[in-house]
Every structure is written in C-alpha cells, then in structure tokens.
C-alpha cells in the first residue's frame, strides 16, 4: 500500500509538474499570441494607411491624367484651329502679295516706258540743238567772211553801184535761203518728235491691250468662281429646303429631338454671346482694377499674417490638448499592464512554491486542491480571454475614434482656412470699395440748413409817415448790425428772435461741423429752405392817402385805421429784419468744408 501511495504521489507530482509546465508554456504562448496580435494589428493599420495613401495618390493621378488628357485635347483642337486659320491667312496673304506684286510690276513698267519716252525726247532735242548750233556756227563763219571781204573791197577799191546792188540781192537771197533751210529743219525736227510720240503711244496701246487681256482673264476667273459659288449656294439651298421639309414633317422620326437640339443650339449661341460680352466687360474691369489692387496688397498681407498666426496658435493649442489626452490614455494602459504583471507574478509565485510540505497530506486533500486550482485557472483563462476581446474592441474603438477625430480636425482646419480666405476676400472687397468711393465720388459741398421761420402774410399794406420813419430806423439798425463782427451779429439775432417770440429749430452751433471728417462719411444734408410765399405790397405816398381819404369821405375814421394797420406792419417788419439777420449770421458764421478725394495714410489707418 505504501508503495502504491508513493507511486501515486510521484505520479501526482509528475502531473503537477506537467501542469505547471503546461501552464508556463500556455502563458508563453498567450504572450506570443498577444505580441503577434499586436504586430498583426500594427501591420494591418500600416497596411490600411498605405492603402489609403495609395488610393489617394491613385485618385489624384487619375484626376491629373484626366486633366492632362483634356488639356491635350483642347490644345490639339486649338492647334488645328490655329493651323486652319494660319492657312487661310497665308492664302489671303499670298493672293494679296500676288496682286500687289502685279500692280507694282505694272506701275514699274509704266514708269520705265515713260522714262524711255522722255529719254528719246531728250536725245532728239539734244540732237536737234546740236544741228542748230552747227548751222548757226556755219552761218556765222560765212557772214564773218563776207563782211571781211566787203571791208577789204571797200578799202582797196571803190565798187560800182550795180555790184553793190547785186551783192545786196545776193545777201537777201542767201538770207531767204537760210530761213527756208531753218524752216525745213524745224519741220524735220517736228516730224521726228511726232514719230517718237507715235512710237510711245503705240507702246502704251500695246501695254493697255495686255492689261486689258489680263483684266479680262481675271474677270473670267472671277465669273467662273462666282458661278461655282452660285451652284454651291443653290445646292445648299436645296439641302436646306429638304432639311426644313423633313423637320416640318410630323411623320418623320426624330423631329422633336432635332427641334430640341436646334433650340438648345440657339440658346447656347445666345448664352455664348452673353458670356463673351460679360467676358469682355470683366476683362476691362479687371484691367482697370488691377492697379487698384496693387495698392492694397501690403495691407492685405499684414492682415493675413495676423490671421494666420492666430489660427496657427489655436491649432497648436488643440494639438497639445490631444497629446495630453493621449498621454493620459497611455498612462492608464500602463497602469493596467502593471497590475496584470503583478497578478501574473503572484500567480507564478503561488505555483512555484515547493510542495514538500504537503507530503504528509492525504491524497483526497491534494486532489481537491488541484481541482480547485484547475477551476481557478480555467476561470482566469476565461477572464483573460474576455479581457483580451474587450481590449481589442476598445483598441479598435479608440483607433476609430482617433481616426474620426483626425478627420474632424482636418475638416475643421480646412473650414478655418476657407473662413480665413473669405475674410481676406471680404477685406479686399471693402478696401476696394473704399478706394472706388474715394476715387469716383465727387467732392460734395456741405450745405448749411436754413432755419425755418414763420411769416404772416398780409394781403394789403398801407404805410403812413410814422411807418416810413420806423422803416428808416429799422434799416439803420440793420446796417449797424451788419457792421458788427459775426459773434455780435449772432447775439443780436438771438436777442431779436427772443423778443419776437420766434424759436429756432436748430441752434447755430449745431451747423458747425468738425474739420477732421473721414473720407468715407460724406454728410448729405437734405434740409432745403422753404420757398417764400408771394405777397402784395402797396406803398403809397401820404398825399395820395389823404386824397383817397378825402374822396371816400371817411376822415374821422382815419386815425383808427392807421392805428390798426400799424401793429401788423410793425410785426411783419420785425420778422423780416430778424430773418435777414439770421440768414446773414448763419451764412457768415459757417464755413463750407470740402473733403479731399485722395487717400491719405491717416484715412487708410482709420479704414483698417
């Protein structure tokens, strides 16, 4: 029995050793599995990131390829259009050059023929002049010889009268002969000139015939081209008529489709014309505003720098907050890992205790203890697996949340960039609007509001000698007030208004505007003075008034009438004098202020 017990105990020890080894190997396998799982997760994440990058690069490259293909197509179309245009221009230039060359050649030929004719005429004239000169020289020599002979004969001997008469007749006959010779020579010269002119005219006739033939050939070619164009036009008209008949035929298929296409074509042509007009106007506007935009570049750059530094600081703070959050999560995970390592070490220490102290224990106690440990081990394995699953799920959730947070962060950053760009564009437009206002708004004059007043309108005024004296006194006071300085004029005006119980709606001090007005706030005063009502005034002399009273026979009532009419006339004169004084004071006390249209650095700072 003891041998069996020892054998069983040895077997139990071997089984426990094997279990411990199996547990140790299982832990090692679990650790390796976790490491492999973590490596697999990392590889999967890296693979996903690289796949996303490659997909993004692929999408970007596809877009670039599409854009480049479209650009190549557009460039090829433009090249073909340019080639056709250049061919047409080259043909037109060739035709124009051919025509101009032909015209120049004809002009040069005409000039050459004219020069030839002039040269022939000059040669002929030179020849004729030489011949005349020779004849004149011969005649002169002959005459000189005759004179010499006559002088010798007169000196040597006295000649008879008959000989002298014969000699005179001979000289006269020779003179006639010479005159006839000269006439013959002149006629020959004229004949030669006429022959030259005839030859030149014949050459011109030949040249004109050649030009006529060329023009006839050109006319024939133009006529043939016109006939061909007419034939082509007739063919096109026939085709157009067939197309219109087919379009108007309701039984033909695709009529509505062709009509829709035609309507769309017409609409697109109209839209194209509108867009061309808009493009031209915008092009002019851009060329006009380019100079204005160059002035605002410095201010806009400073504003963008300020805004960019602010956004970078906010982005940096957000990134620091995210880093702190991730550091806290890492610390929490490290604490959990430390706890698990402590539990693992405790479990290994419990399993590695020597079992020599339990040699005296009973077999049933050892089996019970081993079963209990086995149950605990299974339970711990299950908990470990569940925690691993939860940990992997939490990791995936954390990765998903981090990816989502990064996407949201990117979107937020892009939105901030767009906001920054929109604000900068808004600032640009505001600055541009201010400059355009400064440039194009005319200098407006600040009008001083005219004070409203109340006047009594009397249909008839009858003056008396006393009233004339009062009017003279009022005019004297008015002259005295006009000589006063502006401050005293205002005081006198206000005092007179207080005495007459007429209130001003606006004080004179409110009319004075500050000199430092901004160029963007132009004051538009809409208050305008009311038009004065018309009233009839009849002023008569005292003699006329007395005559009227005598005619009417109301002499005893005249003092009462004058006393009654005296009061309203006095009131009216006082109101008129006060209004005149008020106008003069307001006009003299307020200076007109002009606002400069040029943009100064102080005004630009106020705009910023």
Curated annotation (Swiss-Prot):
UniProt modified residues of type Phosphoserine: 516, 518, 558
Provide GO CC annotations from the record. Answer: centrosome; cytoplasm; nucleus; outer kinetochore; spindle pole
Going by the entry's taxonomy, the superkingdom of the source organism is recorded as Eukaryota
Q: Which UniProt keywords apply?
A: Acetylation, Cell cycle, Cell division, Centromere, Chromosome, Coiled coil, Cytoplasm, Cytoskeleton, Kinetochore, Mitosis, Nucleus, Phosphoprotein, Ubl conjugation
PTM per Swiss-Prot/TrEMBL: Monoubiquitinated with'Lys-48' linkage. Deubiquitinated by USP45.
The task this protein performs is described as: Required for the localization of dynein and dynactin to the mitotic kintochore. Dynein is believed to control the initial lateral interaction between the kinetochore and spindle microtubules and to facilitate the subsequent formation of end-on kinetochore-microtubule attachments mediated by the NDC80 complex. Also required for correct spindle orientation. Does not appear to be required for the removal of spindle assembly checkpoint (SAC) proteins from the kinetochore upon bipolar spindle attachment.
| Subunit description | Interacts with KNTC1 and ZW10. These interactions appear weak and may be transient or indirect. Interacts with dynein intermediate chain and dynactin (DCTN1). Interacts with the catalytically active form of USP45.
Task: Give the protein's recorded name.
Answer: Protein Spindly
């Amino acid at each position: 029995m003891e041998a069996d017990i020892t054998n069983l105990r040895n077997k139990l020890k071997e089984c426990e050793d094997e279990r411990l080894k199996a547990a140790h190997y299982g832990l090692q396998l679990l650790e390796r599995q976790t490491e492999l799982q973590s490596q697999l997760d990392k590889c999967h994440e890296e693979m996903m990131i690289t796949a996303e990058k490659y997909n993004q690069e692929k999408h970007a490259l596809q877009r670039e390829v599409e854009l480049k293909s479209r650009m190549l197509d557009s460039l090829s179309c433009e090249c073909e259009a340019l080639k056709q245009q250049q061919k047409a221009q080259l043909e037109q230039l060739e035709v124009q050059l051919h025509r101009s060359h032909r015209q120049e050649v004809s002009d040069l030929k005409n000039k050459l023929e004219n020069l030839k004719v002039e040269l022939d005429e000059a040669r002929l004239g030179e020849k004729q002049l030489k011949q005349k000169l020779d004849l004149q020289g011969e005649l002169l020599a002959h005459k000189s010889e005759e004179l010499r002979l006559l002088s010798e004969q007169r000196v040597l001997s006295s000649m008879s009268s008959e000989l002298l008469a014969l000699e005179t007749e001979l000289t006269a006959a020779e003179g006639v002969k010479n005159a006839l010779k000269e006439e013959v020579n002149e006629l020959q010269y004229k004949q030669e000139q006429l022959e030259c002119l005839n030859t030149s005219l014949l050459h011109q006739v030949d040249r004109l015939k050649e030009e006529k033939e060329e023009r006839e050939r050109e006319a024939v070619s133009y006529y043939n081209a016109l006939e061909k164009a007419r034939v082509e036009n007739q063919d096109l008209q026939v085709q157009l008529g067939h197309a219109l008949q087919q379009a108007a035929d309701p039984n033909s298929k695709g009529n509505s489709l062709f009509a829709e296409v035609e309507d769309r074509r017409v609409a697109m042509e109209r839209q194209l014309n509108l867009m061309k007009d808009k493009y031209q106007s915008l092009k002019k506007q851009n060329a006009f505003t380019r100079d204005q935009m160059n002035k605002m570049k410095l201010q806009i750059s400073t504003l963008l720098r300020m805004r960019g530094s602010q956004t970078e600081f906010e982005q940096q703070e957000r990134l620091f907050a995210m880093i702190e959050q991730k550091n806290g999560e890492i610390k929490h995970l490290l604490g959990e890992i430390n706890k698990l390592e402590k539990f693992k070490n405790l479990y290994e220490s419990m399993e590695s205790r020597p079992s020599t102290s339990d040699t005296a224990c009973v077999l049933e106690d050892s089996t019970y203890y081993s079963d209990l440990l086995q149950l605990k081990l299974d339970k711990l394995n299950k908990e470990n697996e569940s925690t691993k699953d939860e940990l992997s799920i939490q990791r995936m959730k954390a990765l998903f949340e981090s990816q989502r947070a990064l996407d949201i962060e990117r979107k937020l950053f892009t939105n901030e960039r767009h906001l920054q760009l929109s604000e900068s564009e808004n600032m640009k437009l505001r600055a541009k609007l201010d400059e355009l206002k400064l440039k194009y708004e005319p200098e407006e004059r600040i009008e001083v509001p005219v004070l409203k007043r109340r006047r009594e309108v009397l249909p008839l005024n009858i003056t008396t000698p006393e009233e004339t004296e009062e009017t003279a006194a009022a005019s004297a006071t008015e002259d005295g007030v006009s000589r006063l300085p502006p401050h005293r004029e205002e005081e006198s005006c206000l005092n007179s208004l207080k005495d007459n119980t007429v209130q001003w709606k606006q004080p004179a001090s409110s009319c004075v505007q500050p000199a430092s007005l901004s160029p963007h706030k132009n004051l538009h005063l809409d208050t305008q003075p009311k038009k004065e009502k018309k009233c009839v005034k009849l002023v008569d002399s005292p003699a006329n008034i007395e005559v009227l009273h005598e005619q009417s026979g109301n002499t005893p009532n005249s003092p009462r009438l004058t006393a009654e009419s005296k009061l309203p006339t006095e009131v009216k004169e006082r109101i008129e004098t006060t209004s005149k004084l008020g106008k003069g004071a307001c006009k003299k006390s307020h200076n007109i202020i002009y606002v400069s249209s040029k943009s100064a650095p102080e005004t630009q700072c106020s705009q910023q």
